Amino acid sequence: MALLPVGIRFIISFSRDQWYRAFIFMLTFLLYASFHLSRKPISIVKGELHKQCTAGDGPESPFSDPSSSTRHGPTHWLLNNETDCGWAPFDKNNYQQLLGALDYAFLCAYAIGMYLSGIIGERLPIRYYLTFGMLASGAFTALFGLGYFYNIHSLGFYVVTQIINGLVQTTGWPSVVTCLSNWFGKGRRGLIMGIWNSHTSVGNILGSLIAGYWVSTCWGLSFIVPGAIVAAMGIVCFLFLIEHPKDVKCSSTLPTHPRASENGINRFRLQKQTTYSEKNGPLDPELQCLLLSDGKNPLHPSHIVVLPADGNMAAISFTGALRIPGVIEFSLCLLFAKLVSYTFLFWLPLYITSVDHLDAKKAGELSTLFDVGGIFGGILAGVISDRLEKRASTCGLMLLLAAPTLYVFSSVSRMGLEATIAMLLLSGALVSGPYALITTAVSADLGTHKSLKGNSHALSTVTAIIDGTGSVGAALGPLLAGLISPSGWSNVFYMLMFADACALLFLVRLIHKELSCPGPAAGIQAPLKEH
């Protein structure tokens, strides 16, 4: 018998289940990368919506008033319907506040919508829900770009478009995280989701390059092309997304070690012993360790989420999800971590334009290095948290290093492109690492927490609560940057450093619990002890 071709031998070396999981991994990666691809153009186009006046109109500093040169009549209008100093109404002296309003409109709507999205998503098929969101997102992203071709200069048009786009984009994150968690168990979740979460940076990079290609010649296409890509991926989602392994008769991935307990904050290998609560019977020992309030007494039994035992897993309530240990702390931590990340997402190209005096296209391309650093930061955070089996401690370490790094960034970025490039990579890794870990592995761990008694229906709500709270910070960050930047970019960096410190503060209790509770790092199966 002739030997099978190498390619065929490679294909059959993997099981049917493994091929399906690889397919879902890549599909959800591309689906959410397209969401981020559509969010990036606004930050690239800012430099074109408001730009320095031509030499004939006189010099302009980054914070000077260019509006006087754009109100003298049609002689100052170019063939592409924009003025020498930008696109009305963003050519005025308060352009930073107006551009900040666009960010705030999108992110505030996103934050509010996210709380509702998880609840709605648990009650609808993921494939239909996500398809609708992607088609609508593509339409409203493209609608923003149509303002260029139809010569629209109404601030209200752009703000309303951003609000609706922010609402429909909330369908994405809870859906893809829930789908991926259905297919992948808890083993090496930090590494798997750390790699998978690089879709954020990949989407940002592609969005920057696509938007940058047209920004100086026809900025409307910087929105229309990404919008078309998101809509096309929505059709792909409808045709190919498989919500759960059981839908194609695949097995669900189970934890490798049946005696090892995992909770998303830490993973413990404990001697098999049982504790009891008054009403609920056996309580998982790792859950008891997590619930210890002062090292001696467990918290009130109400902190345990009780679900029906008849096998009919109803969707968890909002308050029930909040009672899962660690949800509130990680949500508040993400609020400040995402504030920092989204400030860079929306304002970094404009900062580079101001400091390094580059045009919008080159600044957009250079800003992608922050996302390149974010890819490595997310993977590194996942690997470290899997190795140490301490999610909160990993986030805390990176947040601790991020604050002084931002200070150095603000100091050396004015020294030339080489210094800016180095600090973009380092800052991207440290800023994006905790953000990536919390929104993926931590959210998935908490959404499948032992206290839920196996109810996977909680995952979408938990993910939405954590990311929704983080999105409040994402809305505040760009808004504050727009208000603070006229007083100097250094003050913006001080604000970001303060936010990192606040994010770390909310993890102190969980870090203390991780370091005080026994774990497998000790190399033995230790009994649960009172501390």
Swiss-Prot record:
Domain of life assignment: Eukaryota
Matches recorded under Gene3D superfamilies: MFS general substrate transporter like domains
Residue stretches spanning the membrane: 18-38, 100-120, 129-149, 157-177, 192-214, 222-242, 332-352, 364-384, 392-412, 419-439, 464-484, 488-508
Compartmental location: Endoplasmic reticulum membrane
Catalytic reaction list: D-glucose 6-phosphate(in) + phosphate(out) = D-glucose 6-phosphate(out) + phosphate(in)
Task performed by this protein: Inorganic phosphate and glucose-6-phosphate antiporter. May transport cytoplasmic glucose-6-phosphate into the lumen of the endoplasmic reticulum and translocate inorganic phosphate into the opposite direction. Independent of a lumenal glucose-6-phosphatase. May not play a role in homeostatic regulation of blood glucose levels.
Family: Belongs to the major facilitator superfamily. Organophosphate:Pi antiporter (OPA) (TC 2.A.1.4) family.
Keywords: Antiport, Endoplasmic reticulum, Membrane, Sugar transport, Transmembrane, Transmembrane helix, Transport
A GO molecular function held by the record: glucose 6-phosphate:phosphate antiporter activity
Keyword ATP-binding included in the entry's annotation: no
Main location: endoplasmic reticulum
Control of this protein's activity: Inhibited by vanadate but not by chlorogenic acid.
One of the protein's GO biological processes: glucose-6-phosphate transport
Keyword set includes Glycoprotein: no
Pfam family for this entry, one: MFS_1
Protein name from the UniProt record: Glucose-6-phosphate exchanger SLC37A1
Annotated membrane topology: Multi-pass membrane protein
GO CC, one annotated term: endoplasmic reticulum membrane
Region (Disordered): 53-72
PROSITE patterns in the record: MFS (PS50850)
